């Protein structure tokens, strides 16, 4: 009798209330959710497809297996690693049913154009994208994705040499865009493009970077809607005299800059290179922080709460 009761009780796992299953599955990572749970039974698949589980697809702990190469795209990704990413993306997108609003990738997870396009087409309602590695993504790939993401509000991206093509697409297609984080040096060209294309941006983070002083001055003058600016652990760069090679690192903000930042709701800065570890790392790495050398997860940090992972 006891064995019969136990057998009946175990069989009822498939009848467990969907709401309870969803609460349990909320504790699981995307890797666990795509590991076969949906194939246990129809009830479990229904729970696995609940939109609340897929509001954020977080792949910030998944890295590509790659080697650096001297020519573009400067990385070669192992086939098995690429296949693993494709599998995760396909399963996630199938289960999410287009409900994903936030998509997060590791800074050493190198998507191809095909992977990016596939993902963009299956989650057109994205509002936030964290995509720090663009080595294998071409202009056509990212522009196609931006055209799909009409509701995009926030983007974390690497510093790029030719920003107009991207920021122009954002301006044309993403009317609610308000938040940008740049990982890497911030040049005058980028600042000018930002002012031209996205003058109404509200939040900008360029932490742990080398920032041209002229570029900083331009955004303070040219972004009238800017409310939050984060330059924590960054240093300013100037060039003295007539020789561009004579680079000067500025470790203190002068009166002119402080006066211009006074209008902001929040101005976040730290330039204490003597005692601050992150300031020291930025300077040692010459404004392009080698995140792989440091504690896992450091790259996710941001003093702006809406950008922190």
From Swiss-Prot:
Q: What keyword terms does UniProt attach to this protein?
A: Leucine-rich repeat, Repeat
Q: Where are the LRR repeats?
A: 77-107, 108-133, 159-184, 208-233
Ranges of residues in domain F-box: 10-57
Q: GO:BP terms for this protein?
A: defense response to Gram-negative bacterium
What InterPro entries does the annotation carry? F-box-like_dom_sf (IPR036047), F-box_dom (IPR001810), LRR_dom_sf (IPR032675)
Q: Which GO terms describe its molecular function?
A: SCF ubiquitin ligase complex binding
Put simply, this protein is called F-box/LRR-repeat protein At3g48880
């Amino acid at each position: 009798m006891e064995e019969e009761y136990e057998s009946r009780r175990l069989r009822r796992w498939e009848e467990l209330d969907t709401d309870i299953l969803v609460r349990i599955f909320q504790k699981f990572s995307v890797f666990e959710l795509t590991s076969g749970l949906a194939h246990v039974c129809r009830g479990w698949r229904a729970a696995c497809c609940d939109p609340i589980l897929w509001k954020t697809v977080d792949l910030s702990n998944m890295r590509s297996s790659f080697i650096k190469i001297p020519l573009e795209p400067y990385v070669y990704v192992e086939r098995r690693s690429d296949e693993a990413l494709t599998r995760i993306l396909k399963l996630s997108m199938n289960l999410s049913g287009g409900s994903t609003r936030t998509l997060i990738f590791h800074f050493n997870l190198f998507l191809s154009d095909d992977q990016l396009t596939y993902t963009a087409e299956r989650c057109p309602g994205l509002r936030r994208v964290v995509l720090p590695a663009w080595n294998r993504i071409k202009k056509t790939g990212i522009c196609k994705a931006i055209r799909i993401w009409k509701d995009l509000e926030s983007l974390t991206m690497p510093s790029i040499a030719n920003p107009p093509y991207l920021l122009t697409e954002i301006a044309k297609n993403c009317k609610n865009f308000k938040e940008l984080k740049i990982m890497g040096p911030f040049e005058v060209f980028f600042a000018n493009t930002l002012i031209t294309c996205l003058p109404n941006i509200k939040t900008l983070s360029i932490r742990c970077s080398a920032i041209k002083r002229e570029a900083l001055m331009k955004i303070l003058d040219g972004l009238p809607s800017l409310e939050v600016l984060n330059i924590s652990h960054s240093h300013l760069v100037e060039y003295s005299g007539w020789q561009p090679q004579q680079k000067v690192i500025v470790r203190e903000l002068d009166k002119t800059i402080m006066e211009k930042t006074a209008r902001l709701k929040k101005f976040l800065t730290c330039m204490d290179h003597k005692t601050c570890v992150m300031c020291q790392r930025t300077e040692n790495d010459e404004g392009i922080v080698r995140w792989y050398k440091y504690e896992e997860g450091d790259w996710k940090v941001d003093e702006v709460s809406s950008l922190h992972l």
